[in-house]
């Protein structure tokens, strides 16, 4: 199965749907779904996903290279792993999504969206994770969901972690730093993301990794993600990564800006970078007689997007943690 990406993009089902790799067995579970199981018993399970948004291609190309290394035998697999290419139709079309943003739909939230290929795919992915985790006895469960951002950023690579009732494990956070993430953002409330779903329902240590800017297939400079790719290779093969000399900065979400109607106005232009700072009292958005202002001494914006559909998030405001 060394043509997983090509088969997924073409919508083709392989003639052979299971087989042997170099020290592991593989099974094609459907378009964009591939399970790899080491021959030796392991107690670790990993979801490695990309392409939830179809225009975010660099992580997909990274996963393709990792799979090639596994199949060639140059990389050893020490995790039971499910590889997910989230939105095959959008990936093939080179667009963010075909109908609705799938990364708002998980945890059953797809039921509140108009039925579409994305709602059906979100449900399929939920079931795939349930089957994957229930069919093993993994002591350690990780989920790394690889993305790229629409906008530029003051931090080229950063991670967004879902709300979690328990403390984060230090080795997981340390690995994120070793993977080159310059900042970590901690959600304080539940959400419809893929990583929140895997964390809430299966207890996985989950993170959305934002790796640069969204570009079409073939236009990505993957060398700028070498540190992340090397950390992933080390993770898969069970090699300990060295601790980052510059630990990621930490932020927490303090508020969400939501667009409710066509009267909504976000006072940030297209050049506003992720993690741009705003001083206390700054007017961020207006909608009718409602005004959104900065309430802390300094807040930082993440994912500003004035053109989202009504009812969806138009941005997050963050506070820097000590």
UniProtKB/Swiss-Prot annotation:
SUPFAM superfamilies in alphabetical order: Zn-dependent exopeptidases
Domain of life of the native organism: Bacteria
Binding site for Zn(2+): 53, 56, 147
Molecular function as annotated in GO: hydrolase activity, acting on ester bonds; succinylglutamate desuccinylase activity; zinc ion binding
Active site positions, chain numbering: 210
Function summary: Transforms N(2)-succinylglutamate into succinate and glutamate.
Protein name: Succinylglutamate desuccinylase
UniProt source species: Salmonella agona (strain SL483)
Top-level taxonomy: Bacteria, Pseudomonadati, Pseudomonadota, Gammaproteobacteria, Enterobacterales
Gene name tied to this protein: astE
